[in-house]
Amino acid sequence: MSSYGSVLFLFSLLVWGTIAQEAPASAAQRCFCQVTGYLDDCTCDVETIDRFNNHGLFPKLQQLVASDYFRYYKVNLKKSCPFWEDNSHCGVRDCAVNPCSSDEVPGFKPPGFKYTEEANHVHEDVDDCEKEKRLSAVDESLSVETQEAMLKWNRHDDSSDNFCEVDDEESPDAEYVDLLKNPERFTGYKGADTWRIWNSIYEENCFKPKAVQRPLNPLTSSRGENEGNMFYNWLDGLCVEKRAFYRLISGLHASINIHLCATYLLKDTWMDKIWGHNVAEFQKRFDATLTHGEGPKRLRNLYFIYLIELRAISKVLPFFERSNFLLYTGNETKDKETKKILLDVLQDARDFPLHFDENSLFSGDKKEAAKLKEDFRQHFRNISKIMDCVGCFKCRLWGKLQTQGLGTALKILFSEKQIENLSESNQPSAFHLTRQEIVALFNAFGRISTSVQELENFRKLLEKV
């Protein structure tokens, strides 16, 4: 080729390269541009997690959490906020209840009435009232058989130290909730109240000094593009434990947002409600252009919390595979079937090839590591308390469950020696999980697993935009 031809060829490559670089990214690329490759502080990549979860673990988890043992969660949704005085609840129609008269609603009867046969067969009398219920209302009705079984379940529980604030199950305000009747989805709960909740979580409990502003924080004045640079320079300079704490909270936040976008109220009439994927809402929360580059980082943190909870589940297998451990609901046949599914899930988790190495946490000077671990635990306990400040009852339900689930995962990760010393005998051991912790752990991981699976759905939908 002549020198002139060579110059022309190189010039053509340069022009086409420039055009390619300037071509606008697609909607899918803007959301998922960083959702690939290896994760920070881990030896695992996004693609391995996608294959493992979406084509293997996800359907088994869904079957598990739909079983009787895992679908009922006892929770107190009436506790007051311990950090600020705020008696307000979600005021949007779909997030608030228009009260019925006292003779129509079981909730206004004496405390024991709601568990009677009469209380659970009032649907014909309150049809008009039911139409006024908001999306965030928690359906607390239980069948007669379930009510009777609940009385027996608690005998199999103990208590233990943990990473989150636990509701007093003996409180008259603590009630069993059927999670299948109360799915986590869009409720219309948004605005200043939600910002205040998440601001308290990030600003006061993520080891962050006041001088460093979190990007896109609506409750603080913006410092422009440099705001993000300052924050991530600070984050990169933290020890791995503090960095992990922030990424866990960010991953949980991302997961919750994905659920709301995936089961969004697309149509609402008095006759019908249609739920489905809201692509525009997903873009608003995760598109790199619309979030100044923050959205894809949040999605990467979703995979980080997935690895943490997956590692915890893999490590707790010895606790559940003991022959004397029962998933007790009173139905022996179903209980055995549920335990079989559970052990299958746990074995799959153990077989995952690229687990997070929890030994990288709290591994320095013993005295400093012990203090850092306690700070870690206290910060997380504060976050679990903040969930009592959420004004939407359905959001509060799932917030409390998911923080307890993550707290239980952390408890497992830092109880390795106690788990190794478990025995088949009925003697008390240093490690134990209550029924509430077990239900929260697997439902919380089920939510994270669902989020990872939903990303595949959103990726396909965005490719059509």
UniProtKB/Swiss-Prot annotation:
Entry annotated with the keyword Secreted: no
Residues annotated to bind FAD: R185, T187, W198, S250, H253, R285, R298
GO molecular function: FAD binding; protein-disulfide reductase activity; thiol oxidase activity
Localization, UniProt: Endoplasmic reticulum membrane
Glycosylation sites: N331, N382, N421
Main location: endoplasmic reticulum
Residues in the signal sequence: 1-20
Cross-referenced InterPro entries: Ero1 (IPR007266), ERO1-like_sf (IPR037192)
Post-translational modification: The Cys-90/Cys-95 and Cys-392/Cys-395 disulfide bonds constitute the redox-active center. The Cys-90/Cys-95 disulfide bond may accept electron from protein disulfide isomerase (PDI) and funnel them to the active site disulfide Cys-392/Cys-395.
Subunit structure as annotated in this protein's UniProt entry: Predominantly monomer. May function both as a monomer and a homodimer.
Full protein name: ERO1-like protein alpha
